[in-house]
Amino acid sequence: MDSNYNYVHMNKPGVVLFASDWLKDRLPVDDVEVRVEHLPPVTEDEMTIQHSSANLILMKNKQLRHEPAWKDLELEDLVNAFAFIQGSSNAEGKNTIEDNFETDPFKSVKEAPMAPFLEANRRHQGEHASMRYFR
């Protein structure tokens, strides 16, 4: 393999004379001939006829094929669904899931670790109302 790095063993004194030339030598850039069955598939962009409005047509087709992304990830519903599992404990260390749910059903949601992230997400969506998709 001529294109891979390798070590030169200086076991003969004449090798030193050619070492600098060997490091400077570059392989020529040649076209590699590949059989038809080994070629990659042709993309749609290469199959189309190139004319002045070809790029506009391709962009419009891509926009029509684009599926809209989710805007709402429904993280609040996810936190609400699993917040009662976490629960909280009272002074004796006993679990008081039922007590918390009866007094304030959203208390465990407010104490959930995802609450700050949900609040930041709400603020971000409010500031960027013109944003259409999450990327």
Swiss-Prot record:
InterPro entries for this protein: Apc13
UniProt keyword Cell division, yes or no: yes
Gene Ontology biological-process entries: anaphase-promoting complex-dependent catabolic process; cell division
One Pfam family hit: Apc13p
Annotated keywords: Cell cycle, Cell division, Mitosis, Ubl conjugation pathway
GO CC annotations on file: anaphase-promoting complex; cytosol; nucleus
Family: Belongs to the APC13 family.
Assembly information from the UniProt record: The APC/C is composed of at least 13 subunits: apc1, apc2, nuc2, apc4, apc5, cut9, apc8, apc10, apc11, hcn1, apc13, apc14 and apc15.
Protein role: Component of the anaphase promoting complex/cyclosome (APC/C), a cell cycle-regulated E3 ubiquitin-protein ligase complex that controls progression through mitosis and the G1 phase of the cell cycle. The APC/C is thought to confer substrate specificity and, in the presence of ubiquitin-conjugating E2 enzymes, it catalyzes the formation of protein-ubiquitin conjugates that are subsequently degraded by the 26S proteasome.
Protein name: Anaphase-promoting complex subunit 13
Organism of this sequence: Schizosaccharomyces pombe (strain 972 / ATCC 24843)
